[in-house]
């Protein structure tokens, strides 16, 4: 089971909802491969793109846009600084926080931790001599105390429990 997630959010300094995407608008999107696929999955949940079926790469060149807009690929940490250049931008919560944005109050949409392959997990090799200790650590990481710690340390939602 997951431990925590730094969720993606869809942000805008120009619009109050995704329904306001203008014809020919722009969406800033993370340029790195794994986070771009996550960003596109989030946009798909909002009816802006359709993800191709199968196990192929998911990127801005493989999705079907369901509205008339363009993507601009940007290095993740730069997205929050250049937010005024786009109608919307999909930004990692930790980058948003570093740029003075709160994922819980400023994002129009936030990525869910439920069944999310991007959640942080504890992994170990079967048969490890420390399996008992690691199992105890896993139990502790999924405790109410850890959940409370995450929620209190990142009240803006830039890190959320995934259990």
Identify the function of each model-found stretch:
Residues 41-42, 61-90, 95:
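Short helices/loops that flank or line small-molecule/ion binding pockets
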Residues 1-49, 147:
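A conserved helix-loop-strand patch within extracytoplasmic ligand-binding domains
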Residues 1-4, 72, 88, 92, ...:
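Short beta-strand->loop
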Residues 37-44, 141-161:
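Periplasmic-binding protein-like
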């Amino acid at each position: 089971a997951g431990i925590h997630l730094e969720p993606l959010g869809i942000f805008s300094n120009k619009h109050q909802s995704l329904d306001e995407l203008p014809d020919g608008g722009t969406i800033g999107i993370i340029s790195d491969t794994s986070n771009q696929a996550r960003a596109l999955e989030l946009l798909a949940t909002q009816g802006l793109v359709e993800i191709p079926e199968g196990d192929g790469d998911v990127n801005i060149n493989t999705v079907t846009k369901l509205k008339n807009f363009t993507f601009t690929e940007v290095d993740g940490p730069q997205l929050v600084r250049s937010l005024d250049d786009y109608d919307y931008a999909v930004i990692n919560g930790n980058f948003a926080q570093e740029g003075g944005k709160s994922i819980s109050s400023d994002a129009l949409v936030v990525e869910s931790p439920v069944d999310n392959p991007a959640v942080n997990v504890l992994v170990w090799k079967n048969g490890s001599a420390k399996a008992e200790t690691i199992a105890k650590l896993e139990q502790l990481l999924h405790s109410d105390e850890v959940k409370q710690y995450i929620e209190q340390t990142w009240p803006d939602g830039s890190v959320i429990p995934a259990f």
